[in-house]
């Protein structure tokens, strides 16, 4: 029995899972703390991919082509996306806190259209991808792109960093408290608007990091963010809103199931994800690791 294709799909699924985690972690954090469903989250991820591409190209022209230039390109794009996220919260999102959910969704959907047209204006409609020129390695009867290990390692490192931040730092504990009772946090004299701005910036920064990490694996293209945001919402629903552990576990489930579904049933890959969502909602409507009630 040739296990090569299964090994390849496993690594592909784990890589997809880590990208989904990086994206969904920011989405879950924003919703858990701010109660905002950011429909433009994946579009900001797409924007970060294009920004990373441009920075990588610029650095290559200045210092010569090298795969190591990807790191400063990703970090620069992530920092820029954090600033963009801070500005979006300050001037747009903040005005929707007392509005109904449909109005919030309309605003973030408008951002999808605006950012999409901005990408088309600056970068055109061509696909963008970074070719690192790294040779594949042979493993278990198949050739594996070693960049899969980079993506998986990055995802695990960010997950560990988020856990440490949320459980071992004062600001992280404030963020966790705001998930369950933001009124009590405000009563303690903590300025909630600043918490919101920093959380939104951090969530967009995670999406930005995911966009840069994803770029050497598959090309960025206009419209791909629409499929990705659906998978992100599925991850957050399965794992439970506001739960980082749930987001991590659900990302692995969705990524691996989607990858193997492409191998066995390509047309039904997305349907398999929705089937998992339906089963989880019937069994645990608040998600695998979510809380049943919010006070």
Regions found by a protein language model. Name each.
Residues 2-19, 165-170, 196-239, 258-270:
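Inter-helical junctions in multi-pass inner-membrane proteins, predominant
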Residues 27-50, 98-103, 171-174, 192, ...:
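Short, non-helical or kinked segments that cap or interrupt transmembrane helices
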Residues 63-111, 118, 249-254, 284-285:
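Alpha-helical transmembrane segments within multi-pass membrane transporters and channels
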Residues 143-220, 244-249:
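Helix-loop-helix "hairpin" substructures at the membrane interface of multi-pass membrane proteins
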Residues 19-27, 40-60, 206-214, 227-239, ...:
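Hydrophobic alpha-helical segments within and immediately flanking transmembrane helices
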Residues 95-96, 101-168, 195-198, 220, ...:
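Transmembrane helix-bundle core of multi-pass membrane transporters
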Residues 11, 34, 39-87:
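Membrane-embedded helix boundary and interhelical linker motif in transport proteins
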Residues 1-23, 51, 62-72, 100-105, ...:
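Membrane-interfacial amphipathic/re-entrant helices at transmembrane-helix boundaries
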């Amino acid at each position: 029995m040739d296990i090569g294709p299964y090994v390849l799909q496993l690594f592909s699924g784990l890589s997809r899972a880590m990208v989904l985690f990086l994206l969904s972690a920011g989405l879950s954090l924003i919703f858990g703390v701010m109660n905002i469903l950011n429909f433009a989250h994946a579009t900001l991820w797409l924007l970060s991919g294009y920004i990373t591409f441009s920075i990588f190209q610029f650095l290559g022209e200045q210092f010569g082509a090298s795969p190591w230039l990807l790191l400063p390109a990703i970090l620069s794009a992530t920092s820029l996306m954090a600033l963009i996220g801070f500005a979006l919260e300050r001037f747009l999102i903040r005005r929707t806190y007392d509005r109904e959910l449909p109005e919030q969704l309309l605003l973030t959907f408008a951002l999808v259209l605006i950012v999409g047209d901005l990408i088309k204006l600056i970068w055109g409609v061509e696909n963008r991808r970074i070719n690192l020129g790294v040779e594949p390695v042979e493993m278990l009867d198949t050739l594996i792109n070693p960049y899969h290990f980079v993506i998986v390692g990055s995802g695990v490192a960010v997950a560990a960093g988020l856990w440490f931040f949320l459980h071992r730092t004062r600001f992280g504990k404030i963020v966790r408290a705001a998930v369950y009772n933001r009124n009590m946090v405000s009563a303690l004299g903590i300025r909630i608007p600043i918490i919101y701005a920093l959380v939104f910036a951090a969530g967009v920064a995670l999406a930005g990091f995911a966009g840069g990490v994803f770029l050497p694996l598959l090309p960025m293209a206009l419209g791909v963010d629409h499929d990705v945001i659906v998978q992100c919402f599925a991850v957050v629903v399965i794992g439970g809103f506001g739960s980082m552990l749930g987001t991590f576990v659900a990302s692995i489930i969705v990524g691996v199931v989607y990858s193997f579904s492409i191998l066995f049933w390509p047309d039904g890959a997305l349907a398999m994800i929705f089937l998992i969502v339906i089963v989880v909602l019937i069994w645990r409507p608040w998600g695998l690791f979510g809380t049943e009630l919010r006070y």
